[in-house]
Amino acid sequence: VIRVEDYLTSVISSEMSATASLELLKAHAVISRSWLLANLSGLQTDKLQLPVGNDTMRNKNANQDNTANCQLSTADCQLKWYERDSHTHFDVCADDHCQRYQGITRASTDIVRQAIAATRGQVLISEGKICDARFSKCCGGAFEEFQYCWEDIKYPYLAKQRDYLTGNKKTAPELPDLTQESEADRWIRTSPEAFCNTTNKKILSQVLNNYDQETTDFYRWKVEYTQDELSALILKRSGIDYGQIIDLVPVARGTSGRLWKL
């Protein structure tokens, strides 16, 4: 058992640099506290509506006792998602599935403790409820909406947005319609201006620990798999043997261009 504020002291030191600026650490403390308390308070409980009907069944490879970490089969679709119930013996885990937590012995600084103390008890609120404040170190240039990443729930505070200056179409064009394949293809294959599209070491040292800075292609990258490797990977992730994968066809994308149906 650990107190919330002690937990957060480690989280903001583990997720980002413990030597970041005070205001950045304070903002992260509020965001991380909001995510934690939203989940601990059970705001995620019983929201998931499982499909029903004669053409729907729970996949035989799914965990039968866990509705929040399961897999469903329909006549033409496989749906799999993961949530916090993938660990049932503790509230949150120590890695990116929840929040990076490297223990209370994690090296901290006076400025981290100051940020926690200055924001003690502060959370983000929307419509009277604590916000399920999801975050990432690099968004790829556009924020994604909650319903395309986790569950089919639309939160007004997790809306699509270009990660750049807004209001001036010359210096900050509007976010393209990345649900359209042609626009998404162009967006992904180029490197649009964005706050997180930077190689500035001073900026990166504010938000990344030293070991995270070893990665340099975090904004755009390329990974290649052989057909056998891809088939094995999908079998491992889904528990279903589809045989040899002949093609991967994009079917639906979220507002950031990320695939949610393939």
Task: Name every feature range the model reports, one short phrase each.
Residues 1-262:
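Conserved, single-site charged/polar hotspot
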